[in-house]
Structures are given as structure tokens and as C-alpha cells.
A protein has these predicted regions:
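Histidine-centered divalent metal-coordination motifs
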Residues: 51
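Short, solvent-exposed secondary-structure junction/capping segments
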Residues: 31-34
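A short beta-turn/loop motif at secondary-structure boundaries
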Residues: 39-41, 119-122
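Helix-turn-helix
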Residues: 45
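Short, helix-capping/interhelical loops that line the mouth of catalytic, cofactor-
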Residues: 1-10, 55-120
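Hydrophobic alpha-helical core bundles mediating ligand binding, dimerization, or RNAP-core interactions
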Residues: 15, 19, 26, 93, ...
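Individual transmembrane alpha-helices with interfacial aromatic-anchor signatures
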Residues: 121-130
Length: 130
């Protein structure tokens, strides 16, 4: 197995693990829980998810052609707890992850790490569905 294939498999598995952990955590929370904070200096789950999503969108959009932080990102706005429901929280969460996952679906990235189309198809299916 080529090193590019091994590397991508490890990266994909790690991202899947992090997303699954987040999914399971959010699933256990009530509508009220997503806004709970320990004190005025801490952030709610809603704010943390909003910030993580904003970070993923900023960092993974045009990942190979532009540098990290994008000019259109309003990072300070991510720390305002204005998510109105758990379903909205999930839409924000999924939006960030979709940008990250779509990055791994680009033919250019596939060619950079030297994956065959057959190997990539298998990897892509596991990334999307598991």
C-alpha cells in the first residue's frame, strides 16, 4: 500500500472519530443543554459548535490554494450564542463537516497523494457513510 493511501486512511479515520464523538455528545443534549455555560467566561455547546464549524469552513475552503483564515470569516460573531434550536445546531455542525469532507473528495487532492480511482472510491464511501 502506498504511503499516500495509508496517510489518507489515518486522517480520514481520525476525522471520523472526532465527528462521531461530537455527534454522540450533541445527541445526548436537550434544547436547553446546548446553551448551558458553567459561568460567564465559558462557552456553551452552541457557541463551541458554531466556532468549530466556522473554523472548518474557513480552514478547509480552498485549502490547497489559499492560506487558512479567510477574509470573509467573522470569528467574533461565532462567539454569540444565537442558535435557536438543536436542529439549527446540527445544521451548523454538519455544514462545517461537509466543507471538510468535500475537500477530501476533490480530484486534485486524490492525485496529490497518488490514490487510484478504485482505492479512492472505497475511501470516499467510508468517509461519507461511516
Amino acid at each position: 500500500m502506498k504511503i499516500g493511501n495509508v496517510y489518507l486512511k489515518v486522517v480520514v479515520e481520525r476525522f471520523k472519530s472526532v465527528k462521531t464523538l461530537g455527534d454522540k455528545t450533541i445527541e445526548q443534549l436537550s434544547e436547553q443543554d446546548i446553551h448551558w455555560t458553567y459561568n460567564q467566561e465559558s462557552n456553551s455547546v452552541a457557541v463551541i459548535v458554531k466556532h468549530l464549524s466556522g473554523n472548518m469552513i474557513s480552514r478547509w475552503t480552498d485549502f490547497l490554494t489559499s492560506d487558512g483564515e479567510k477574509e470573509n470569516r467573522n470569528r467574533d460573531e461565532e462567539f454569540i450564542d444565537d442558535i435557536s434550536s438543536k436542529s439549527e445546531l446540527m445544521r451548523v455542525w454538519e455544514k462545517g463537516w461537509n466543507v471538510l469532507i468535500d475537500t477530501f473528495l476533490t480530484p486534485y487532492l486524490i492525485s496529490l497523494i497518488g490514490l487510484s480511482q478504485r482505492t479512492w472510491t472505497s475511501t470516499r464511501i467510508s468517509l461519507i457513510f461511516y
